[in-house]
């Protein structure tokens, strides 16, 4: 089961992607196909010891830039590395795609080439957040800035399946992100969504607040892509700021430096917990295949872990489990009664 890696999309492509892919092949034994300019890719591979590693190169002559229109780029740049990578999955040459390129284009390519799963109107980008007791899955974190209640319900069902079969949570607690836990809080979107969620075969616990993402009280947090992207960027900025503040305090006095030396292991463990590279990337849920969206500035470690998680996702057959749960949650023509309306692939407004 090969993983196709878009090696031309990231801020530091193809150097970072190739190094991360080589590490994944060496450490985890994952077969990888590097998709991009064959000459540049082979030049990067020459810098590594690839003897005995299952690494293939697939040529793609075009690149989707970070500022390209997502849907236009996917349709017009038919030989772009990201579209070719998804075409490999469609053709059975790979089981998953990993990309650190334009997130909107990655999402659009996944939907355009592989199409949405039956019962899904909007694919969603999910992200794991560190908590005091493990991890919380938040979705959507940027795939769809405007959502209807039915979309959030679909996100909840997909997130529940992911938490159960990927995160290993027996009975995942699903919460709807709002400005308070009381039923009277929220807006029209959250109130309508909450009423629908209570009818679904999931462990829905009601409204949760932003702080609950990190305190371990909920396993899956559902929101629209606008709110989710703000939460994601806020958490990234906070983690970076806290790191800088700690460094400044440690350097402020000799006693602080002694204290740091004595507590270095604890600091390193904390750094590892909040390091996005440990999580690799954000899975794109709701397409007929596996897609992993990485941060544009990902380092080799992040790419390596994204490849590992994408491979595990495919091996566990999570999409099949999602299809079963969707059929259970939306029997017959229930989706039509609840106001589902599927747009054309690639037309969603995406938060970058």
UniProtKB/Swiss-Prot annotation:
SUPFAM superfamilies the record matches: Isocitrate/Isopropylmalate dehydrogenase-like
Entry's localization field: Cytoplasm
Keywords: Cytoplasm, Lipid biosynthesis, Lipid metabolism, Phospholipid biosynthesis, Phospholipid metabolism, Transferase
Basic and acidic residues bias locations: 328-339
Annotated segments matching region Disordered: 328-352
Spans traversing the lipid bilayer: none
The protein's enzyme class: transferase
Reactions listed under catalytic activity: a fatty acyl-[ACP] + phosphate = an acyl phosphate + holo-[ACP]
GO molecular function per UniProt: phosphate:acyl-[acyl carrier protein] acyltransferase activity
Cited InterPro entries: FA_synthesis, Phospholipid_synth_PlsX-like
A GO cellular-component term linked to this record: cytoplasm
EC number(s) from the headed UniProt entry: 2.3.1.274
Recorded metabolic or biological pathway in which this protein acts: Lipid metabolism; phospholipid metabolism
Pfam families attached to this UniProt entry: FA_synthesis
Record-level GO BP terms: fatty acid biosynthetic process; phospholipid biosynthetic process
Protein role: Catalyzes the reversible formation of acyl-phosphate (acyl-PO(4)) from acyl-[acyl-carrier-protein] (acyl-ACP). This enzyme utilizes acyl-ACP as fatty acyl donor, but not acyl-CoA.
Self-association state and partner proteins as the record states: Homodimer. Probably interacts with PlsY.
HAMAP family xrefs: PlsX (MF_00019)
Xref: PANTHER family: FATTY ACID/PHOSPHOLIPID SYNTHESIS PROTEIN PLSX, PHOSPHATE ACYLTRANSFERASE
Family in the record: Belongs to the PlsX family.
Name of the protein in its database record: Phosphate acyltransferase
Annotated source species: Geobacter sp. (strain M21)
Underlying gene: plsX
């Amino acid at each position: 089961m090969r993983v196709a890696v878009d090696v031309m999309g990231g801020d530091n492509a193809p150097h970072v992607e190739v190094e991360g892919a080589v590490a994944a092949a060496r450490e985890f034994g994952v077969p990888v196909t590097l998709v991009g300019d064959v000459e540049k890719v082979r030049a990067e591979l020459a810098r590594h010891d690839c003897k005995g590693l299952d690494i293939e190169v697939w040529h793609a002559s075009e690149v989707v830039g970070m500022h390209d229109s997502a849907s236009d780029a996917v349709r017009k740049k038919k030989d772009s590395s990201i579209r070719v990578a998804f075409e490999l999955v469609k053709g059975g040459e790979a089981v998953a795609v990993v990309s650190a390129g334009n997130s909107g284009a990655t999402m659009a390519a996944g939907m355009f080439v592989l199409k949405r799963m039956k019962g899904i109107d909007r694919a969603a980008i999910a992200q794991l957040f560190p908590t005091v007791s493990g991890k919380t899955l938040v979705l959507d974190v940027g795939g769809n800035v405007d959502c209807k209640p039915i979309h959030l319900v679909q996100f909840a069902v997909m997130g529940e399946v992911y938490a159960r079969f990927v995160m290993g949570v027996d009975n995942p607690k699903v919460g709807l992100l709002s400005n308070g836990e009381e039923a009277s809080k929220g807006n029209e979107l959250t109130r309508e969504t909450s009423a629908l969620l209570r009818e679904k075969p999931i462990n829905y616990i009601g409204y949760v607040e932003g702080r609950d993402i990190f305190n371990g009280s909920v396993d899956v947090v559902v929101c629209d892509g606008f709110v989710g992207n703000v939460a994601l960027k806020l958490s990234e900025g906070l983690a970076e700021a806290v790191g800088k503040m700690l460094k400044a305090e440690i350097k402020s006095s000799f006693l602080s430096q002694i204290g740091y030396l004595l507590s270095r292991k604890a600091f390193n463990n904390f750094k590892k917990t909040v390091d996005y590279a440990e999580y690799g990337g954000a899975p794109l849920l709701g397409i007929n295949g596996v897609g992993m969206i990485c941060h544009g500035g990902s380092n080799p470690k992040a790419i390596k872990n994204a490849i590992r998680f994408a491979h595990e996702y495919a091996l566990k057959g999570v999409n099949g489990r999602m299809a079963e749960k969707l059929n259970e949650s939306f029997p017959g023509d229930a989706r039509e009664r609840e106001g589902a309306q599927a747009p054309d692939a690639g037309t969603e407004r995406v938060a970058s």
